[in-house]
Amino acid sequence: MSIYRLNRLFNPESGRALDVAVDHGFFGERSFLTGIENMAAVVHALVAANPDAVQLTLGHARLLQAVRGKHKPALVLRSDVANVYGNPLDEHLFSHHVPNAIEEAVRLDAVAICANLMQLPGRPEIREANIRSIMALRAEATTYAMPLMIEPLVMQDNAAGGGYMVDGDTDKIMTLVRQARELGADLIKADPRMMSRTITR
């Protein structure tokens, strides 16, 4: 992991990082696009708001990195895609990472890459796919000194809607956070309110 990249991610005064994710189009769900239809305008607004980082996909990362000047948010690159958010769900679920995600992150001058670690009821194959992706990304991230951010997501059945919703069970999330660290996460992406509870337990 490169401390030099992390120096561009974390606020030097607070030691914290606000990473605004607008990578939702990657997952192929129409409902995720509300408010982010015009990505050039979205990125322009975020640069003006000046969070610590903006999380983008391969297709839109250049919108941020094309902005001139020193004072702009850092780039966190989304490295994986899945179809587990549908309502109703597709018959076949998948989760894959971009094969050359680390090299792309280096070329795009990202400060970190982000990958999911998901727990879905009755779908252990998705967690297995995530773990395979994380292990592959970890090996290449080490070679290029690219910080690896893992986003633990615990989901619950949405029986009425036919899909999954986020499960706020702290014990389940804590288990995934621990597993993410054991798999080599340099960074954990989470709601700060939930994170304080999982870290202190």
Region locations from a protein language model:
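N-terminal basic/disordered segments at the start of proteins
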Residues: 1-12, 18
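Alpha/beta enzyme core
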Residues: 17-70, 74-85, 89-201
